[in-house]
Amino acid sequence: MLSSSLSNDNENNRRNYVSKSNKNGLVFECSELKEELKRLSIMNRNNIYSNVWMRNIGFSKQQQVRNYSVLPTNAKKIKEHNKSALDLSGFTPEYIRNFCIIAHIDHGKSTLADYLLKETNTITAELLKDNAQFLDRLQVERERGITVKAQSCAMFYEYNGKKYLLNLIDTPGHVDFSYEVSRSMGACDGALLLVDSGQGVQAQTLANYFLALEENLEIIPIMTKIDQQTAQPELVEEDMTGILGVEKDEIIKVSAKTGLNCQKIIPAVIEKIPAPEPPKVSEGETPGALKSLIFDSWYDEYFGVVSLVYIAQGSVEVGDFIYSHANVKNSAKPTKYQVTKLGIMNPDQVPTDKLYQGQVGYLICGMKSTKEAQIGDTLYIWDSKIEPLPGFKQAKPMVYAGIYPLNTAEFDKLRDVIDKLLLTDRSVTIEKETSAALGTGFRCGFLGLLHMDVFKQRLAQEFTIETIITAPTVTYKIVTKNTGKKTSFNTVEDEIIEYIDNPNDFPENPEAEVYEPMANCTIMTPREFVGDIITLCQERRGVQIHMEYFSAERVSMQYKIPLNEMIYDFFDKLKSMTKGYATLDYEEAGFERSDVVKLTVMLNKDPVDALSYIVHESKAYFKARDVVQRLKKLISRQLFEVNIQCAVGLKIIASEKLKAFRKNVTAKCYGGDITRKRKLLEKQKEGKKKMKQLGSVSVPQDAFTVLFSEGEIEDADLSD
């Protein structure tokens, strides 16, 4: 406990706190203490393993970073902590291996990563018991049991009398996060390709395999979960040799859960995966100059942007002044950054004074926003001349939706937290938009529905802000005939092409040609479910491209399906009808002409912009009936009748009426002339009619959230 006493000296703005529990009776200055606790809480959280791994790889006590769980008592000691850092100069490229783990979802990536951390003494077995899937740090990853963010970790391992630095990157397996995988491969020279011994080669296994081949990575095939009763190692081995083209003697059969045969993995990594090599030097470049690739970043409350970098060439140390190539290219007056902190992830932040060629680590240099820290950018010393590294292909969103704060007063907060979240997820695109029903928000592009759902969950869990996400849609291509508009060359274009991702931008012109995006889908399934899958794909307007039997029981089916037919429940239905055995991978396949229409929802003839949909003409009626029936249950009864309608153009195709509350105005009439009752009823009728003309229907904010879900809806609370 700290007891406080107000000082009466000449410094009126300072308050001193005396620690009764401290043997020396140390006095803390409040201003210094506040700053120390902020900085040291981060240091303590990020460096609790520092002494453990340094002892394990043979560093002396003098070389070890002090344990940050013992808090220093003044600013001078904090500086001493910062000076005490790991020396990585002994790990030249020949003693470095950079690799990632790739696989289909739930094929054992995170479990194998846990084993490697334990085998290299990066973390203890006791700590791992309470923290399975150690590298899955996000709450959403823990709850869903999936990897969302690629995580890196530096491991030290002694092999044949030599110490090696192994940089591991654990990647996601779901197709919605394939951009994370491709980014991670940019910092790697090899990959561990995992295949579940009970499920065999799946759709995302193939997708990741081809990504690794494109990056020229050395691939080590590994069969996982061989200890399970459902394991079929012989059949899966045939799959791997036949589909992936690997040799049987190359496959390492392991159980990461029990550790069976896992001791073969690290030697294979050291022997088979090549050491990192510098890029070729172009004419005019400064020889040996720093080339550092940013392949991930996140926001720290106290230090700003933290960039995860791969040192492709040269070295960087604390105090260096660096430029960002993207900043230099796009700014008339580029910003010069000074490196303030460097380190490696082991698995948390461990400081070092310098990073060398081939190494992976974090870098802090005073960047503050997403515009400054661009994924795929090249960092270099300010006075050198270099050619930038290739970087990454920008992810193209497949699904769009509007995101609005549940509380409209929290728009500024939503803008700030989205900006911070974009540092860790650059595949999301945003654009400000306004809705009459929901207020001001953002139009966001995602790689898939799971990606969108995870993004919303992270907003709620990491930044405590509740949001409304509108119905997802895709990008449509609109082609209209030009009526005489001239270009800058004074010529008339034959047609005008534009792309829209918001239903409210859908053209009213009936002569406009609409093209919808298509997707090439690869479905891997057991043979017994082929018939059901064909029916599902036909219902979603799919066209079969190819079907191949890899074995007596395994089938690969390729379909071209409109992307709009896949973004709702296609994957869920596929999993349900195949008992979870079928897997799906897809990629964009251009645009095709389609008869799609805009579905407008109206309440008492007033359109609700947030409830517009774009659907195929053949399904417009069924969608309209579903929407009006769901709205009828969600909207509370009013004092006047509410007409809920869905229209395509000027034609109403579905309608429901929500009856008004009715007061018994004749309750006080006891017998007498019937004309008195009629007069009261006519007066009430006229009042209701006038109220309907002047009144407006309010849709509760939380009703939008329920409406955009696919579950059953209970009737609205009529007590309001």
From Swiss-Prot:
Topology in membrane: Peripheral membrane protein
Compartment(s) of residence: Mitochondrion inner membrane
Listed SMART domains: EFG_C
Residue numbers binding GTP: 103-110, 170-174, 224-227
Catalytic reactions on record: GTP + H2O = GDP + phosphate + H(+)
Superkingdom of this protein's organism: Eukaryota
Start and end residues of each tr-type G domain: 94-277
Entry's EC annotation: 3.6.5.-
One example of a Gene Ontology biological process annotation: translation
Protein name, per record: Translation factor GUF1 homolog, mitochondrial
Organism from which the protein derives: Naegleria gruberi (Amoeba)
Organism classification: Eukaryota, Discoba, Heterolobosea, Tetramitia, Eutetramitia
